[in-house]
Regions:
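N-terminal cap/lid segment of alpha/beta-hydrolase-fold proteins
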Residues: 21-54, 441-447
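Catalytic cores of eukaryotic secretory-pathway lumenal/extracellular enzymes that build
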Residues: 86, 95, 138, 146-154, ...
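C-terminal, loop-rich substrate-recognition/catalytic regions characterized by aromatic stacking residues
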Residues: 206-213, 307-584
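Cap/lid segment of the alpha/beta-hydrolase catalytic domain
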Residues: 49-118, 165, 302-313, 434, ...
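Active-site-adjacent alpha-helix of alpha/beta-hydrolase-fold enzymes
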Residues: 268-289
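Alpha/beta-hydrolase fold nucleophile elbow
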Residues: 120-133
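Short beta-strand/loop motif that positions the catalytic acidic residue
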Residues: 252, 258-260
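Accessory cap/linker subdomain of secreted extracellular hydrolases
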Residues: 79, 143-251
């Protein structure tokens, strides 16, 4: 027997504030069981407008984070004329089966859509809501093409093998924290949120120079999933089965709203889905796909905040995303007007000017690509106060620049122990290079200049080891010396020519390294500011450490360590340069 009860959604405070308009109620159905094709039953909690009389569209969130955590969203949409279903994925919460991240949500999502569509309280139209993993769920469900899926609105959608569990084939220590969060059937929220514990364990692995594959043992949660992921260090068939193929993108026909942020940790994933649909989709389908890029971090793609990691944005950044979702669902499933905010198919926020701008497509932005060449005086670019230069002047025959990465150097760990609430403005790393890095600055901007889109960095480099990792970052350095992080990229040297085929480096050979995986950003760079390019080899407790031996990186330890001596060239025949998209 299913239990029913009525939830009084609005608080007494709201009731007193607006006594002329009684708070709407919703009806909740606890413990609905959704059958899947293999006999497993998923758990759902259903929220419906009180005393619903007519069938309505259904919105559902498919989550490994326990459906109850989305109560506020469910009641919001139920108060506004929708049935809302919070569905625990297979093996999580009160759902049956075993949870294997990213593996089953596509087929299971299809079955959920079709079951919801057949219920008497549904009018046959089903939509999805959610971000991060629940954004991934939307894309993997869509690739199965359930007939009654009317629209998806993926926010900060993770993309397997693009931004999680690795980025450009470099694993993050965070993955074991996330796997612990989603271990078993409960929420594990307090364990997940104990940052002190996780930093201590990541530091333990780092200080002892243990192989990355031992991380699950070090934290006390040995999982087969962690080891399985490490066995697939590139985007192979295992990962590719989880996301839409090029052929799938050609078949998409429903409206889509993609939401991400300048500082969304899953921006690479969200934009990969979007860009591949723009590349392979039909013209009619692309015309129904809208994109919003706000000045937000990961959580801000669902609940925007003015302050993000040391940056403060204007009130214009605070889009009411609940209301925007409602308008989108009204438009796509009820024949309502197009959402007010969506003035064109691409909406992006220009930080530094605090305005929203619109375009028909990313290509329609038509930026002027400004090429800035790297140079230095006397081969010295290894200090923030004695940096190299970025300029439009063609390179001359100058001495190359050099830096060194010793994977046994543990000094950076001491700088990474505290939580940093100002991560986007912090300059600790550029002030503490420890010989590991090169820095290049432009001249001061003579006028405020909008830079919007993707940058590209090309470096000609040689080294004396068969492999290492590179990290590149671009910042705005203001006239007062403070800085703002703009975008970043990472590369494992063995994958310099292909993310799926490794090719170890021949020591001493000069190779071209093209960094083209930077995140999208938009900023009005202030008059008097400079741009700073920072190149280094990552040496962080938060990342899989490359010990430079050329072996499988997850298996390397301090015993395999080799110091990398890296040379960057910027002469006429080997011009290293940065390309930035300037809006005229």
């Amino acid at each position: 027997m299913l239990a029913y009860r009525v939830l009084l959604v609005s608080s007494l405070v709201l009731a007193f504030c607006n006594a002329t308009e009684p708070p709407k109620q919703v009806d909740m159905q606890w413990g609905a069981k959704i059958p899947l094709r293999d006999g497993v039953h998923l758990n759902a909690t259903l929220y419906r407008p009180h005393e619903q009389k007519d069938p309505l569209p259904v919105i559902f969130t498919f989550t490994p984070y326990i459906g109850d955590s989305y109560l506020d969203r469910a009641t919001y949409f139920s108060r506004n004329g929708y049935v809302y279903a919070l569905v625990d994925v297979r093996g999580r919460g009160n759902s049956e089966g075993k949870f294997e991240p990213f593996a089953n949500e596509g087929r299971d999502g299809y079955d959920v859509v079709e079951w919801l569509a057949k219920q008497t309280w549904c009018n046959g139209k089903v939509a999805m809501w959610g971000g991060s993993y629940a954004g991934f769920d939307q894309w993997t469900t869509l690739k199965e093409f359930p007939p009654h899926l009317a629209t998806i609105v993926p926010a900060a959608a993770a993309h397997p093998a693009v931004d999680f569990p690795f980025f450009h084939n470099v694993y993050s220590s965070y993955i074991i924290q996330w796997l612990t969060y989603t271990s078993g059937v409960t929420g594990n929220t307090n364990t997940f949120g104990d940052s002190g514990y996780w930093k201590s364990k990541f530091t333990d692995l780092y200080m002892k120079h243990l192989p990355f594959q031992e991380l699950d043992r070090v934290v006390g949660n040995t999982t087969t999933v962690f080891r399985k992921w490490l066995d697939h260090p590139v985007a192979d068939a295992y990962w590719n089965a989880m996301a839409p193929t090029n052929a799938d993108y050609k078949k998409i026909s429903i409206p889509i709203l993609t939401i991400t942020g300048h500082y969304d940790g899953d921006q690479a994933g969200a934009m990969t889905y979007y860009l591949r649909h723009m590349q392979y989709g039909t013209e009619s389908a692309k015309a129904q796909h809208y994109l919003i890029v706000g000045p937000w971090d990961h959580a801000g793609t669902r609940t925007p905040r003015r302050e993000v990691a040391g940056l403060t944005f204007a009130d214009t950044s605070l889009v009411d995303l609940n209301y925007l979702h409602k308008q989108w669902y009204d438009w796509t499933m009820k024949g309502g007007p197009k959402p007010d905010f969506l003035r064109d198919r691409v909406a992006y926020y220009v930080a530094g000017e605090d305005v929203w701008r619109y375009a028909a497509s990313l290509e329609a932005l038509s930026p002027k690509v400004q090429k800035l060449y790297l140079s230095s005086t006397g081969g010295r670019a290894d200090d923030v106060f004695r940096s190299g230069q970025l300029s439009e002047a063609a390179p001359s025959q100058t001495e190359p620049d050099h830096f060194t990465y010793d994977p046994l150097d543990i000094r950076p760990a001491a700088l990474q122990q505290k939580n940093n609430p100002n991560g986007l403005t912090d300059q600790t790393d550029v002030l503490n290079l420890f010989g590991n890095g090169l820095i290049y600055h432009t001249d001061r901007f003579e006028s405020a200049t909008e830079v919007t889109g993707y940058i590209k960095f090309v470096a000609w480099m040689a080294m004396d080891v068969p492999d290492t990792d590179f990290a590149v970052r671009l910042d705005e350095v203001k006239a007062d010396g403070t800085s703002v992080h703009l975008t970043s990229d990472m590369m494992r040297a063995r994958y310099r020519d292909s993310l799926t085929q490794e090719k170890l480096v021949k020591p001493g050979e000069v190779n071209r390294y093209e960094f083209n995986g930077f995140t999208f950003f938009s900023r009005k760079v202030s008059k008097g500011s400079r741009l700073r390019l920072f190149l280094s080899c990552p040496n962080s407790i938060q990342l899989e450490k490359n010990y430079n031996s050329g072996k499988m990186v997850a298996m390397e330890s301090g015993k395999d360590a080799r110091t990398a001596h890296i040379t960057l060239y910027h002469d006429p025949s080997r011009a290293s340069f940065l390309e930035i998209p300037v809006i005229q």
